Amino acid sequence: MTLNVYFVLLSPYSLQSVPLPLTMQVIVPRRGDHVGCRNAGFGAHCGSNPQTPKLHQEHIKMVLQKTNWLRGVVAEGSFCYPKAARMPVLVWDDDLANLASLHTKGCVTETNKCRSTERFRSPGQSSYEISGDTLPSAMDILNFALRDWYLQKDNLTRKDIGSYPAGEDKGLKNMANLISDKVTAIGCGLTHWEEGKLKRALFTCNFSSSNVPGHPIYQRGDNFATKCAKTHPYYKSLCNSDEHIKPNK
């Protein structure tokens, strides 16, 4: 069911909860809530002193560089994977980032809440939680998360590339999100809080599309980028950012 829904997103970058008007056409789930609805602040699991720091341009640049590097080498056939015929370079999307930030403000890694946006009906999601007596810098947390997701390549096989497995996640979902050729955009958020003497942080990225069981993670080709209308000038094994990909198909 598709409805035009009007709601207010609270700023993921401020403890003052500044209202930001946002109009989205969302795909309303029959069960469960949208993460952007009735989200008045931090969740019950956030302990004390929760904060959602802003991700600056240097953080965004790093996420895009590392993610597109990985997509590029996978498209070329690294890790014994098939070459990708039409894998696009990723760009940052503010709507996906806002909803990722709202997700982290719940301080729970996995939820069933809908995260659709006007452009993207069924975004994928990857989360990473870290805790300790002290926390690393935001940049280090982002690096640790991307490395953790990347290492799932050891669980992702050529067979999985051709047909995303159904059932319980076997430690491959996050790597599959990173290299899906339906994904064109990414947006991330970070929240940290305290539980007694322990400090915790949750980093989440939303992807513009999610993998569907039984469908390929990406379309293989005899060589990389053979079906791109135009390749990216730097990531030459990836399609340019204006490649016409249908993320909702």
UniProtKB/Swiss-Prot annotation:
It comes from the Eukaryota. The keyword RNA-binding does not apply. Residues 1-23 form the signal peptide. Keywords: Cell adhesion impairing toxin, Hemostasis impairing toxin, Platelet aggregation inhibiting toxin, Secreted, Signal, Toxin. Its main location: secreted. A motif (Cell attachment site) lies at residues 31-33, 220-222. GO terms for cellular component: extracellular region. Pfam families: CAP (PF00188). The keyword Signal applies. Expressed in salivary glands. It is found in: Secreted. GO terms for molecular function: toxin activity. InterPro entries: CAP_dom (IPR014044), CAP_sf (IPR035940), P14a_insect (IPR034763). SUPFAM superfamilies: PR-1-like. Residues 64-207 form the SCP domain. Belongs to the CRISP family. Inhibits platelet aggregation induced by all agonists tested (ADP, arachidonic acid, the thromboxane A2 analog U46619, thrombin, and snake venom snaclecs (TMVA that activates platelet through GPIB, and stejnulxin that specifically acts through GPVI (GP6))). May act by competing with fibrinogen for binding to glycoprotein IIb/IIIa (ITGA2B/ITGB3). This is Tabinhibitin 4.
